Design a protein with these regions (language model features):
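Alpha-helical scaffolding segments of alpha/beta enzyme cores, especially the outer helices
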Residues: 10-13, 119
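Active-site-proximal helix-loop-helix substrate-binding element of RNase H-like nuclease domains
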Residues: 8, 15-17, 21-114
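Short low-complexity, flexible loop/linker segments enriched in glycine and/or proline
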Residues: 13-16, 134
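Residue-level detector of family-conserved "landmark" positions at structurally sensitive sites
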Residues: 1, 88-90, 131, 169
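Residue-level "edge-of-site" marker
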Residues: 3-4, 92-93, 172
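Acidic, metal-coordinating catalytic cores used for nucleic-acid/nucleotide bond scission
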Residues: 1-10
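Common nucleic-acid-contacting/processivity interface regions adjacent to the catalytic cores
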Residues: 96-180
Length: 180
């Protein structure tokens, strides 16, 4: 849950600090990793791309394939809404205090995230839905999260099956400029 904005950046930064850039590049089969900075949800985020490695974030799947807006998309809230389960809270002032004072319960707390996402998948089958859609459309599973590319390919495949060739998109130059 929220691996793109939390888990992956955390792992990247830890590997970079502890092992260096060369080890970080080993995450990619082609030794090619890149990062970019984006602003979303009112904050700056560092995102990382591991060439040759794809991942699905259940947070993205949930937002894409459920049709009711939630007051919060924190895993704790979604698990309560969908499963009737809540995560246990942090008994310390900070996560660092918890980590240093009671490492075992800190680990158990983090394992809850994995178990809750697993239970959400058991109930909702969003990964299964994503993979089925990707297979049917003959696309990479990450393409299912978009809207335009997925539908373009579905339409193309449908027309191709009927031996209908669609014309190439024409390039046109803009002849006028408009303010705005």
């Amino acid at each position: 849950w929220n691996t793109e904005f939390f888990d992956i950046p955390y792992l990247f930064n830890r590997i970079k600090i502890l092992c260096g850039d060369d080890e970080l590049k080993r995450l990619s089969p082609w030794r090619n990793v890149s990062d970019k900075e984006i602003y979303t949800m009112g904050r700056r985020h560092q995102l990382y791309d591991i060439q040759g490695v794809a991942h699905l974030d259940y947070f993205d799947l949930y937002r894409k394939f459920t049709y009711t807006a939630q007051e919060s998309y924190r895993l704790d809230h979604i698990a309560y809404v969908e499963l009737g389960k809540k995560k246990s809270g942090n008994p310390y002032e900070t996560f660092k205090d918890w980590y240093t004072k009671d490492f075992q319960s800190f680990l158990e707390y983090n394992i809850q995230d994995v178990e809750l996402v697993d239970r959400l998948e058991d109930k909702m089958k969003l990964i299964e839905l994503c993979l089925t859609m990707a297979y049917d459309a003959k696309v990479n599973f990450m393409d299912v999260l978009g809207s335009t590319k997925y539908w373009d390919i579905l339409i193309y495949n449908f027309l191709h099956k009927k031996n209908i060739v669609i014309p190439q998109k024409r390039k046109s130059e803009k002849s006028e400029k408009f303010e705005g």
